[in-house]
């Protein structure tokens, strides 16, 4: 940044010097035209921080939640506002208003337990939901304000949170980190994120073709507040049918259209095909269906459909009513029918049919399911809104039942106060919301929606892993199927989704991440837009006759035809002009589609969009003056929108635009300019320096490893008590930064250290990416980290008034504590700072033996017997007690948390990685005296084998080394931003100026012989991350140990001190070697040898020398077999299969 300002100053001075008037009269001045912009090319990235202040990254979650709390809740209440009683017609209860977290009377918010306290005390961070109600009591109508009906979990940093708009000092008071992204919930003390869910868009027609079966189908998923259903228009043997789940069989399309009131075949033909003869030829065959079935009137058609409806209702309707009901409410449910006027629905079905006919005529006219414009992203707000509405309906139902129960009794009916029973059910809403968020299972009765894995625990491995989790998109696609379509990188994802950040393995391409400048829209009202369209010259669809429908472009609002327009281009331009002047919401998109002759307007939520600079007449509208005002704080990002300099485009509208990547590329026909090209990457991929010089999978690997790097987590990391925390002791910010690093504040909470690296071979312990580390560097703290583990204990209270207690420590005859209790304090808890070794106790808890007995009312002072239930430390290395916290949980039980700390220095086998997807383990640690050094006496911290470069092609790593070296010598932090950054020539020039080699190679001397090495060595700083995979956590061996109860074989897994299994493949290998005794020893003697008595005669097993089958003891032979084999034989016997052992003597006499 400093360097940039210096450069800018010199630039301005030059202009002052050369301000001679005659120079300016020449057409070209200093290589620039007069009309050229000054310096904007470098400066327009200042729009990025301005954008991230208002939108982007985590703001999507917050906006969505705020919209739900402020707008959606009120809509839900309005839809379900009345509760009436079946018993007493006089009674009613009406919800007037709803608020979260603040009462109507006082302007202040309620006191909420601060989020940090909720984390420590295992509570839920939530605010009360208040309603104002009006109801009858006897003859009176009563208004009641601020009735609490439950508690709503609050998203951190949303507008109902304490941290909303808090400055740094207030954050510090609340023990919160100002850089923490927010956007998650705290439920029972754990941080839960609702991931962005990806789905196909609702209420839109999607045409697909199945080439194998030769089927073309158009489907639309209708989603309303009451129901979700899918309607298909499909082809079968060249004829077209309508299909719906609630109708038993497919119905010919002509009959459906007749049922909707379009009776003449000519009109059906006009609606579907217009004047296009080729479409008419394809469609004509469908008109015969109705005459075959003798259906000519609307009533006949409705009866035909009614007969086919699957009935689920209790009261019987006539066939005609069934048909009307099906067409009015079931088929294409998102269109409402008023006064039995089916015209709109007929047009919609005709449009679907037309799309099918077009696809039959031209197979290219089908839609792509994986195209980003056909997808919608669901955010936390929408998901909780569905959940809350479900719970609220259930709450009202239970409420009504309990009111009816009371009103039925004749004596109580006079003065019944409904308020008394509202509190009984209020727990339903609270626990329903909490359960859904903590388990991640969304099950809604109305939609038959069952979804698992919606929420995840926020990963706090590093600051980046938490941030990356907020931008993750999970798609509801089965991971097991190996389909390449949805996993592929779509061109429409450009700028919307990060190209590099996706996991490898089965979820590859299904789990995506948002790019840096994306925003996800929320719903906007449709009605005003509809009116606006009619004002701008759209003819209302209900007034157009069928014949002229297809002569002009159709206008669609959220997929529904609302009219037609004669001059589409003019209409689109006018509409965009209104949007740019701020008369219409900036997130509404409009685009024309010439293939379908349609103009589409979209106002629905869940579309991905991103901001672009508007270009008019070959000039970027953002001028230098605007950027200066932005830097001075006179303008913010919203002003740029209002002034019509910047606008949001979604994927569909991007297809209508011509976008320049750089200002120098602008030609007159272009419509937009990218704000910055590097924003096609997301937050995690933005950390990589010079990613455009790397092979693409390397960037993908780094995205996965950057989330596992140990570093600083948050400013409040020492106040937190998490299950497992990894912290680096001396994190450094990288020498080579990127713009993204500054934007997401990674330089304030970094995860890694700048290591001096020599690229050379040393010792042979560096084969296959292993690293050679310098022992002295480790002594000085390179790569040192600490782990913190939490143990939680609850002191329970039992029904019979007994409770768990913490005992004191035991002492020996000298008055010293016994070895097991050495780390305890006098109160029976570990003392802070004490060392705990494996086998020592650090919480000395005792439990009453009679806790299960019934409460004893008579003799209260019975002496309670306790047995010890201490918490014992188990671990290969000793730990230190870091914090002890005592508190009270929600249900008034004492809660004790102890945090254990371990300091770790790097050892052989610990995993490191650079920022270019090059991971390696530490292969050997060498003393500084034996390491090579250069003529200034600098010794590398890491020696890396040069064979890591050729096949990986990570040129970015080499450039990072040169930039970092130049930065160190020059005293600046260099930039390795994608598609930009510090130029290699400039860096090399700095190296030469400072007396180093142009290519970053140095002369090194051997540390062993002191002679000069025979080659120049590539030598300089590279940013290295220490990953969470450490040997100490994985090391495992076993000689003897526990065995499983059932099979009597050694247990499995490191945590249970399990054995190492010699599996099937290893067994085959041993057989191939012919080492049969080894096989016997491993698979039986050392595993689960067992002596059985086998009867030679019948081949079944007996016991203690007696064959139970033959009832004799003659032919019993003792032999050793694996216990698992004996178990198998007995299990087979229980299933009526008799495995008989045929024995023969090996050593025949």
Curated annotation (Swiss-Prot):
Major place of residence: nucleus
InterPro entries (UniProt xref): DNA-dir_RNA_pol_su2 (IPR015712), DNA-dir_RNAP_su2_dom (IPR007120), DNA-dir_RNAP_su2_hyb_sf (IPR037033), RNA_pol_bsu_CS (IPR007121), RNA_pol_bsu_protrusion (IPR007644), RNA_pol_Rpb2_2 (IPR007642), RNA_pol_Rpb2_2_sf (IPR037034), RNA_pol_Rpb2_3 (IPR007645)
Protein name: DNA-directed RNA polymerase III subunit RPC2
Additional remark text: Present with 1950 molecules/cell in log phase SD medium.
Keywords: DNA-directed RNA polymerase, Metal-binding, Nucleotidyltransferase, Nucleus, Transcription, Transferase, Zinc, Zinc-finger
EC class of the enzyme, as a word: transferase
UniProt family annotation: Belongs to the RNA polymerase beta chain family.
């Amino acid at each position: 940044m400093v360097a940039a300002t210096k450069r800018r100053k010199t630039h301005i001075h030059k202009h002052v010097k050369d301000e001679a008037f005659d120079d300016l009269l020449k057409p070209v001045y200093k290589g620039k035209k007069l009309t050229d912009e000054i310096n904007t090319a470098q400066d327009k990235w200042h729009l990025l921080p301005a954008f991230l202040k208002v939108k982007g990254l985590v703001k999507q979650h917050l906006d969505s939640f705020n919209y739900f709390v402020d707008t959606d809740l009120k809509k839900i209440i309005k839809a379900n506002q009345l509760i009436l009683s079946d018993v007493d017609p006089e009674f009613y209860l009406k919800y007037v208003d709803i608020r979260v977290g603040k009462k109507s009377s006082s302007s202040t918010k309620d006191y909420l337990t601060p989020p940090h306290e909720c984390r420590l005390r295992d509570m839920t961070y939530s605010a009360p939901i208040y309603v104002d109600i009006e109801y009858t009591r006897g003859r009176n109508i009563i208004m009641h304000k601020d009735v609490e009906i439950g508690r709503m979990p609050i998203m951190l940093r949303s507008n109902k949170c304490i941290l909303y708009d808090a400055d740094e000092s207030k954050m510090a008071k609340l023990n919160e980190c100002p850089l923490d992204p927010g956007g998650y919930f705290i439920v029972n003390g754990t941080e839960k994120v609702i991931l962005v869910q990806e789905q196909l868009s609702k209420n839109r027609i999607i045409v697909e073709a199945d080439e194998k079966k030769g089927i073309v189908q158009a489907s639309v998923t209708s989603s309303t507040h009451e129901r979700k259903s899918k309607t298909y228009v499909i082809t079968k043997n060249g004829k077209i049918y309508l299909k719906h789940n609630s109708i038993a069989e497919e119905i010919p399309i002509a009959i459906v259209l007749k049922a909707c009131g379009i009776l003449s075949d000519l009109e059906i033909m006009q609606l579907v095909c217009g004047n296009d003869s080729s479409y008419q030829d394809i469609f004509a065959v469908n008109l015969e269906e109705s005459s075959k079935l003798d259906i000519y009137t609307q009533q006949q058609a409705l009866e035909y459909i009614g007969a086919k409806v699957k009935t689920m209702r209790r009261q019987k309707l006539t066939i005609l009513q069934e048909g009307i009901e099906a067409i009015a409410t079931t088929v294409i449910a998102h269109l409402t029918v008023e006064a039995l006027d089916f015209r709109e629905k007929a047009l919609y079905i005709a449009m679907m049919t037309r799309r099918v006919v077009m696809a039959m005529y031209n197979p290219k006219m089908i839609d792509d399911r994986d195209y980003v414009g056909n997808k919608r992203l669901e955010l936390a707000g929408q998901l909780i809104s569905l959940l809350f509405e479900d719970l609220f309906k259930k709450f009202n139902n239970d409420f009504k039942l309990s009111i009816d129960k009371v009103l039925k009794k004749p004596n109580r009916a006079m003065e019944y106060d409904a308020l008394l029973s509202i509190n009984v059910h209020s727990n339903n809403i609270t626990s329903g919301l909490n359960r859904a968020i903590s388990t991640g299972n969304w099950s809604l009765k109305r939609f038959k929606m069952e979804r698992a894995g919606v929420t995840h625990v926020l990963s706090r491995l590093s600051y980046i892993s938490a941030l990356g989790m907020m931008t993750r998109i999970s798609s509801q696609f089965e991971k097991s199927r190996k389909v390449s379509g949805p996993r592929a990188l779509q061109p429409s994802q450009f700028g919307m989704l990060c190209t590099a950040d996706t996991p490898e393995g089965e979820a590859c391409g299904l789990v995506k991440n948002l790019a840096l400048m994306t925003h996800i829209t929320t719903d906007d009202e449709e009605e005003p837009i509809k009116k606006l369209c009619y004002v701008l010259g759209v003819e209302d669809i209900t007034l157009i006759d069928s014949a002229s429908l297809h002569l002009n472009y159709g206008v669609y609002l959220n997929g529904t035809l609302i009219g037609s327009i004669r001059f589409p281009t003019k209409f689109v331009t006018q509409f965009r002009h209104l949007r740019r002047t701020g008369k219409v919401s900036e997130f509404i998109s409009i685009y024309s589609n010439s293939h379908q002759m349609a103009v589409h307007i979209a106002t629905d939520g869940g579309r991905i969009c991103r901001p672009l600079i508007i270009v008019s007449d070959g000039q970027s509208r953002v001028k230098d003056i605007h950027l200066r005002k932005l830097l001075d704080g006179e303008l913010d990002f919203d002003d740029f929108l209002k002034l019509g300099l910047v606008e949001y485009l979604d994927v569909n509208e991007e297809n209508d635009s011509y976008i320049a990547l750089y200002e120098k590329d602008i030609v007159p026909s272009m419509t937009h300019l990218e704000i910055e090209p590097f924003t096609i990457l997301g937050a995690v991929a933005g950390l990589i320096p010079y990613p455009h010089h790397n092979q693409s999978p390397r960037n993908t690997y780094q995205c996965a490893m950057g989330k596992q790097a140990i570093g600083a987590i948050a400013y409040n990391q020492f106040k937190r008590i998490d299950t497992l925390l990894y912290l680096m002791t001396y994190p450094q910010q990288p020498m080579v930064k990127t713009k993204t690093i500054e934007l997401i504040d990674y330089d304030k909470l970094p995860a890694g250290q700048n290591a001096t690296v020599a690229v050379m071979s040393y010792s042979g312990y560096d084969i296959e990416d292993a690293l050679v580390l310098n022992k002295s560097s480790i002594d000085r703290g390179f790569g040192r980290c600490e782990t913190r583990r939490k143990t939680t204990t609850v002191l329970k209270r039992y029904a019979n008034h007994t409770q768990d207690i913490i005992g004191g420590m035991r002492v020996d005859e000298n008055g010293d504590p016994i070895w097991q209790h050495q780390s305890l304090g006098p109160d029976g808890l570990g003392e802070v700072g004490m060392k705990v070794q494996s086998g020592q106790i650090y919480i000395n808890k005792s439990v009453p033996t009679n806790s299960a007995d019934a409460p004893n009312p008579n003799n209260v002072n019975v002496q309670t017997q306790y047995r010890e239930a201490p918490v014992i430390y188990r671990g290969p290395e000793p730990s230190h007690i870091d914090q002890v916290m005592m508190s009270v949980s929600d249900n008034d039980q004492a809660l004790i948390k102890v945090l254990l700390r371990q300091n770790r220095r790097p050892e052989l086998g610990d995993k490191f990685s650079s920022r270019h997807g090059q991971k390696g383990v530490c292969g050997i640690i060498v003393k500084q005296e034996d390491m090579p050094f250069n003529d200034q006496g600098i010794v590398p911290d890491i020696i890396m084998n040069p064979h890591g470069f050729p096949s990986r092609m990570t040129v970015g790593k080499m450039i990072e080394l040169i930039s970092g070296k130049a930065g160190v010598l020059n005293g600046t932090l260099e930039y390795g931003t994608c598609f930009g950054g510090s130029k290699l020539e400039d860096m090399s020039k700095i190296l030469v100026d400072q007396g180093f080699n142009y290519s970053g190679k140095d002369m090194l001397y051997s540390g062993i012989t002191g002679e000069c090495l025979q080659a120049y060595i590539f030598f300089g700083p590279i940013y290295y991350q220490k990953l969470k995979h450490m040997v100490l956590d994985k090391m495992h061996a076993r000689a003897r140990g526990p065995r499983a109860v059932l099979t009597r074989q050694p247990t499995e897994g490191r945590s249970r001190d399990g054995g190492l299994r010699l599996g099937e493949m290893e067994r085959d290998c041993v057989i191939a070697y012919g080492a049969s005794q080894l096989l016997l020893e491993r698979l039986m003697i050392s595993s689960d040898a067992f002596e059985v008595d086998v009867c030679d005669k019948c081949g079944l097993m007996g016991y203690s020398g007696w064959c139970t089958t033959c009832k004799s003891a003659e032919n019993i032979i003792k032999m050793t077999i694996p216990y698992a084999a004996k178990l198998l034989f007995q299990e087979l016997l229980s299933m009526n299969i008799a495995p008989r052992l045929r024995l023969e003597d090996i050593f025949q006499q």
